[in-house]
Amino acid sequence: MRSQYCGDVNKSHVGQEVTLVGWVNRSRDLGGVVFLDLRDREGIVQVVYDPDLPEVFDVASTLRSEFCVQVTGLVRARPDSQVNKDMRTGEIEILGKGLTILNSAAPLPINMDKNQHNTEEQRLKYRYLDLRRPEMADRIVFRSKVTSAVRRFLDDSGFLDIETPILTKATPEGARDYLVPSRTYKGQFFALPQSPQLFKQLLMMSGFDRYYQIVKCFRDEDLRADRQPEFTQIDIETSFMSSAEVMAKTEEMTRGLFKDLLNVDLGEFPKMTFAEAMRRFGSDKPDLRNPLELIDVADILKDVEFKVFQEPANDPAGRVAVLCIPGGAKLSRKQLDEYAKYATIYGAKGLAWMKVNDLDKGLEGIQSPVLKFLNEDVVNGLLERTNAKTGDLILFGADKANIVAEAMGALRLKAGEDFDLLNGEWKPLWVVDFPMFEPTSDGGLHAMHHPFTAPMGITPEQLEADPTAAISDAYDMVLNGCELGGGSVRIHNSEMQSAVFRILGIEEEEANEKFGFLLEALRYGTPPHAGLAFGLDRIVMLMTGATSIRDVMAFPKTTTAACPLTNAPGFANPAQLVELGVNVIESEDNKEEQE
């Protein structure tokens, strides 16, 4: 039905007759000549119909937005004065000779113009129309190019694309599972996988030493801009490769993606330990485009007569750190109050500040609500440590170390955006040497990555003797403050795996009930293995400049995990529930909806 895509027609086709199909992006009648912008997934081309062919011209005059049409015409160069440099096809146009309406379009329920606003609900309800818009179509096409490039690289590197089950068993991976009732085993449930973690480890035990899969994963968790109940991972696992080798291979793949698809040279990724990232940036996924760093000042403030500073400065578990924001002294008191309120979201009890109005005037050039507690030596020490200049603002964080890191890390990001401090387009890095465990609110321990991550350089006995000192052989790839992917070396012997379960409070009976198959498999010559999983949606979001992963998924859910297009989720037929042995407990929420 067509000779090429609309967006592919160029000056090399001048003088040729082409047949194109697509949708009417815009139609206008200018002085007896109809100009038609025809659009398909590859772009837009201008078609011109004049009255010399009255039958075709009359049909062209009836066209409206989103009519689906077939066009035949002659490619001709535009005069220099009419070249449109904003269009790929802006040097040419099609002189229309034939026109067939393949399907008409009713008045549209959403605005198709990129400059017109549609609500998120409207866009998702009429997603098939929203996806026709060039900026959306471009992202979906780009996503396809990413997956093709990933497959090509991994296939060429000897990896095997192997599918793993979707109906599986619940595993403790940090979020709620989506459950699927079994008809044949009434009262029992499958779980949709949060990741293929255990199956890909079992594939290593099966001898398939290089595995990958572009796979759907499911997590029933609270949603944010970068979260969806179903999402896609680029899942990778290898045997007989160290963490350094896995990092090198996946870094090579990532650099290739950016070079091939964006012509961006990311260069070699620097490595930073978790401890250094938290100390300098207050985050385990630091945005290195932001030049601000947390600066420790507990030694300067440990003797001041101000408990807010003094107590954490002398507490082994406390921390006092500052941010020095260039030009920040221009913030008003109201704006500083907004910063303080923002810090409380992340656990801070308040926010002390110091304005450097005039460095040459000593204490007289300093403005701060806590200045009365600070002598000249302390102020000079702070100014020297932070290298503050006239016009700068110093923000103080003083509390338990984890609260200071989280609150000051959040303020660092906010200040970086507010003061336009971000420099450089792409700043990748590896974050390594994570703690094996982190404390829970009830005094227990939680695996920082997952329970199958191996510790570095210790025995099971040493791990159980002091689990909080253990460092995991884990690694995260971070780009511009976003975690692209995370992975680790896995535990490959049953003694170490059982020790980790005990530390996490998973007793032997529970471990055997949930993971007996894994513990059994570990007894039969399991090879050393390691892997990594990338968030495909997040990678495409960053590479295309989208603000949400919803804009790089064809049919995403809303922030309440619903699909306005299909009205999913919905109520099941009562007969189906009886067959499944499932009884719905009535609540006020679902009672109203069923009525």
Curated annotation (Swiss-Prot):
Belongs to the class-II aminoacyl-tRNA synthetase family. Type 1 subfamily. PANTHER family: ASPARTATE--TRNA LIGASE, MITOCHONDRIAL, ASPARTYL/LYSYL-TRNA SYNTHETASE. One of its GO terms (biological process) is aspartyl-tRNA aminoacylation. It is found in: Cytoplasm. Catalyzes the attachment of L-aspartate to tRNA(Asp) in a two-step reaction: L-aspartate is first activated by ATP to form Asp-AMP and then transferred to the acceptor end of tRNA(Asp). GO terms for molecular function: aspartate-tRNA ligase activity; ATP binding; nucleic acid binding. The keyword Electron transport does not apply. Its EC number is 6.1.1.12. Keywords: Aminoacyl-tRNA synthetase, ATP-binding, Cytoplasm, Ligase, Nucleotide-binding, Protein biosynthesis. It is an enzyme of class 6 (ligase). HAMAP family: Asp_tRNA_synth_type1. It comes from the Bacteria. It catalyses: tRNA(Asp) + L-aspartate + ATP = L-aspartyl-tRNA(Asp) + AMP + diphosphate. It holds the Pfam family GAD. L-aspartate binds at E173, R219, H449, R490. This is Aspartate--tRNA ligase. ATP binds at R219, D220, E221, Q228, E483, G535, L536, D537, R538. Gene3D superfamilies: Bira Bifunctional Protein, Domain 2, GAD-like domain, Nucleic acid-binding proteins. Homodimer. The gene is aspS. It comes from Shewanella sediminis (strain HAW-EB3). The keyword ATP-binding applies. GO terms for cellular component: cytoplasm. InterPro entries: Aa-tRNA-synt_II, aa-tRNA-synth_II, aa-tRNA-synth_II/BPL/LPL, Asp-tRNA-ligase_1, Asp-tRNA-ligase_1_N, Asp/Asn-tRNA-synth_IIb, AspRS_core, GAD-like_sf.
